[in-house]
Amino acid sequence: PDLPTRMEIDGAPLDPVQGLVLMLNKPLGMTCSHKEEGALVYDILPDRWRRRDPAISTIGRLDKQTTGLLLLTDDGDLLHRVISPKRHVAKVYRAGLARPLTGTEGALFASGELVLEGEDKPLAPAVLEVVSPTEALLTVTEGRYHQVRRMFAAAGNHVETLHREQLGGLVLPADLAPGQWRLATADEVASIFTAPESVG
């Protein structure tokens, strides 16, 4: 059965059992790595949760300037299933661009032939959905370093804002404000491994 999404005793969150999955709306300016300077996403969690064993870790990362859906878990098997290249879990990003789209980006990103600067292996095909002249949704199935930003750079543009809206079929809940988190239900976790629907 699903766990309640939030349990409290005297107003303080109760420690959930092992195998928890948290959905966080990552705010701007927070990092996912202890190796970087600045506020960590883990700082949002109750202090004692950060001392759990096994430790809570992010499932993949979002860079400091990227906002949106970030999952955290103490389930190592789930973590590796989600980030495994064999799973092809899709990630949907909303990108705000410095310059209007030219109309050529969709074919370039879908070609499976785009090679990012400094790399040898082409990117897997990605799907571009135009929202406005300077805004687009991009669905990718890989997690290369700063991939979305570098893809638009390869197309002659610059990403000014980047927000992850979906991971597989799991959509960032509309009622989860930046910096807020809650426990994911079993159905929500299962939806990670389904195909995303259009969120435009």
Regions found by a protein language model. Give the residues of each.
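Basic, flexible Lys/Arg- and Gly-enriched helix-loop patches that mediate nucleic-acid binding at interfaces
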Residues: P1-G200
